[in-house]
Amino acid sequence: MFLVLATIIIALIRSASTQSLAGCYESIVSFGDSLADTGNYPMLFGADTHTPSYVLPPYGRTFFHRPTGRCSDGRLVIDFIAQSLGLPLVQPYITGRDRSFSKGVNFAVIGATALDFDFLGSIGFPNTFTNVSLGTQIDWLKEFLATIPDGRKFLQKSLVLMGEIGGNDYNHPIMQGSSLEEMQPLVQLVIHYIGSTIEELIKLGAETLMVPGNLPIGCFPFCLAAYKDSSSAQDYDPKTGCLNWPNDFTIYHNQLLQKELSRIRELYPHAVLIYADYYNAAMRFYLSPAEYGFSKDIILSACCGGGGPYNYNGTGKCGIPPARSCDDPASYASWDGIHLTEAAYRLIAQGLLQGPYAIPHITTACPAFNRDDDQLYHY
């Protein structure tokens, strides 16, 4: 009886915590890559002969029942955050230039990098997927702010989501088979650019920014498949089956990112920088799949793929025959080998909104908790 009562109380506390977020922010401003893009990529490159499978079924099958430009079977972390804040799903900027962005605007683009397209090419790590970088997205933001009456106030009352961004600066080299030694010099450059962009956003008016770290890519099918033939047994974590060195690399990136956020907090004490610990929020279900509703024997395999190790190969991508989708995406963490399922993104979002994986907790930065009602800005 006590256990049942305790379970009910915990559920009520979590529900109240999530509900209390409604009214915290009047809009969301989002940057990033495929972890956050809600539809920009198809409008940017839809007529291109290299149109990716992401805009084809079965993408979007679980929630939207059609492809939306999201790289998943359903909703992303940004969607769950928007819903928890009582806001509509965030509109992609490119597809909605004639729409209202009063409740949010999304500049994220599938495949985007933190570092500039030309710069990456010049150092031997070309982005063959898109020429959009974080700098491009900031230019779009400035273009947008110039079209509204008070762009500074709009940013002040918004929750700014900084991606995740930076993962593709490493993912593209990984897909090309680059070594750890080759990628290591990129990290300081990526962190510096993310940091300088955050400072620029604060100067433009942003006061609350959520900055995610990178996910454990050593657990992703595309990475596991890429290094399968060159890895030995000791290269894998016996508890999860994930590759150790890519995860260690991600931890290194995330540690430097947190140090950069600490530096910026000292320079701009009025701004609230929330570190979103995507890595540990995700590692929960790789360490204990069954506890979170996933099947242990397929936790490292893609739901939708063309076969091969981990059901991922570069020539049989999800959305393009003969690749096939699994019957139950909710039992998988990986959707297409590169991106996660809605079920996995939901767990990460819950870890940020209800758990210990947002530092500081998102409610501590809620303007509604710190301002009188008549001070709230309505755009």
Regions found by a protein language model. Give the residues of each.
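Conserved active-site regions of diverse hydrolases
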Residues: 1-379
